[in-house]
């Protein structure tokens, strides 16, 4: 029996792609193995968002040369954004790679494996056909949750981001296909799904028939078995009031909204090519808080973008204080070759970036704690996810708003079970609770 092992790097879209690759491999007789040493096929699904991600992948590919020497029939395949970006260069850097597969081509994995088995090594397919998004069945790794891609690509071209260059232009799956997949997942016992897209708010715009993300949200409402629908990532430019209305009236869309701002300075937002102002963003967020009951808002922020002055940074700090996010994912700007920002003047010194990041985190951590504290004494439904990675005597689950709740291990509970939890103590990043029974 042939076996396979997949390394998955990067975002949730890559995780979803790996699940679809798994299904294709198993359809022709491969079985998964947890021991990479015994695999007949090793596939690396890669990320190119940051340079250190590529460094990790090339390091792993180098380590795998030992297994290729030991097993001359071992097939080594590389797919994902790094494969799309570097293409044939990968064979030059690592000649022991057999297959390079682009972001639009995972449906061809089995035929490329057959070619390698016939002796035709160095197979490559990185064509970016934006005319159709193939419907591929997945093998979800989760027991109660599943990733559901609704589109691929991005049309935004933020000046710091490589994604449009490696994922291509936006192309959406038909509403009917997504509804069918989610309905089947609900029938199989999955109760939480996450809708995936580089920019879910531009979903359906390529159809040019009025279909948008709100249309999809309405179509997914009330599907049997599906308790929670999460979605990521949103872009403020394409978010509309009608979409927000759909999110607010849905019975299974979660209360968590992740809406990246990236900077609190209009000048920097323009340099980033984000196509919105801070004022427009605040108006959107105000409408979200009006229409989505108990909404929990998180964001992404980049500090040290080229040309960011102290005044720009202070504007970002003020935005945090004005908006009061439940959590902010903060990043130091790092150059990405192939993007306009990498060659911009006025690159910010690394030490300045580090100081700004710490200042930002200090302000946000205080806000996060202040927003979590009122949860104490309240009861929230959580879905049990399993043992805490840091403490085997504690389990954890998440609220609809994506707040993590830790509670004492309870063998009477099952992973995927929805239970009420009384919040005993709230901290900056997590809450501690007691499961309510009876």
Where are these regions (language model features)?
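Short flexible coil/turn linkers enriched for glycine and charged/polar residues
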Residues: 141-144, 154-156, 253, 263, ...
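Terminal RNA-binding accessory module
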Residues: 343-438
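Glycine-centered loop/turn positions within well-structured domains
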Residues: 107, 156, 201, 237, ...
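Glycine-/small-residue-rich active-site loops that bind phosphorylated ligands and cofactors
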Residues: 13, 49-52, 82, 236-238, ...
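Proteins enriched for Cys/Gly/acidic motifs involved in redox and nucleic-acid/cofactor modification
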Residues: 1-203, 242, 257, 279-290, ...
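Conserved SAM/AdoMet-binding glycine-rich loop
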Residues: 76-78, 85, 187-310, 321
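Conserved, mostly hydrophobic/aromatic
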Residues: 158, 178, 195, 231, ...
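Radical SAM enzyme [4Fe-4S]-AdoMet core and its adjacent flexible, acidic
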Residues: 11, 204-221, 225, 272, ...
């Amino acid at each position: 029996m042939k076996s396979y092992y997949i390394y998955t790097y990067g975002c949730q879209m890559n995780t979803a792609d790996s699940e679809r690759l798994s299904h294709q491999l198993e359809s022709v007789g491969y079985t998964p193995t947890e021991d990479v040493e015994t695999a007949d096929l090793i596939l690396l699904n890669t990320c190119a968002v940051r340079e250190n991600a590529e460094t990790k992948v090339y390091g792993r590919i180098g380590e795998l040369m030992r297994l290729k020497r030991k097993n001359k029939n071992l097939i080594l395949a590389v797919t994902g954004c790094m494969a799309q970006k570097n293409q044939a260069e990968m064979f030059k850097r690592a000649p022991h790679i057999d297959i390079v597969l682009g972001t639009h081509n995972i449906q061809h994995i089995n035929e490329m494996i057959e070619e390698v088995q016939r002796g035709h090594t160095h197979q490559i397919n990185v064509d970016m056909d934006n005319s159709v998004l193939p419907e591929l069945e997945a093998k979800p790794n989760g027991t109660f949750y599943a990733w559901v891609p609704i589109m691929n690509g991005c049309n935004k071209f933020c000046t710091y981001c490589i994604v449009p260059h490696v994922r291509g232009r936006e192309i959406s799956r038909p509403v009917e296909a997504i509804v069918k997949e989610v309905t089947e997942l609900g029938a199989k016992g999955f109760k939480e799904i996450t809708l995936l897209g580089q920019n879910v708010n531009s979903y359906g715009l390529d159809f040019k028939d009025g279909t948008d993300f709100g249309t999809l949200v309405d179509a997914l409402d009330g599907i049997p078995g599906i308790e929670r629908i999460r979605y990521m990532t949103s872009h403020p430019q394409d978010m509309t009031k009608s979409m927000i209305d759909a999110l607010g009236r849905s019975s299974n869309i979660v209360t968590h909204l992740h809406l990246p701002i990236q900077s609190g300075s209009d000048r920097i937002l323009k340099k980033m090519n984000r196509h919105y102002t801070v004022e427009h963003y605040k108006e959107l967020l105000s409408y979200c808080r009006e229409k989505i009951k108990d909404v929990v808002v998180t964001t992404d922020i980049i500090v040290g973008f080229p040309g960011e002055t102290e005044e720009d940074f202070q504007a970002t700090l003020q935005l945090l204080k004005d908006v009061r996010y439940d959590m902010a994912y903060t990043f130091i700007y790092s150059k990405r070759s192939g993007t306009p920002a990498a060659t911009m003047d006025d690159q910010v010194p690394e030490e300045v970036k580090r100081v700004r990041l710490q200042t930002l985190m200090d302000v946000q951590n205080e806000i996060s704690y202040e927003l979590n504290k009122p949860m104490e004494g309240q009861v929230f439904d959580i879905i049990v996810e399993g043992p805490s990675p840091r403490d085997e005597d504690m389990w954890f689950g998440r609220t609809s708003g994506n707040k993590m709740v830790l509670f004492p291990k309870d063998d009477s509970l099952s992973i995927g079970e929805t239970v009420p939890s009384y919040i005993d103590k709230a901290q900056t990043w997590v809450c501690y609770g007691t499961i309510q029974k009876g």
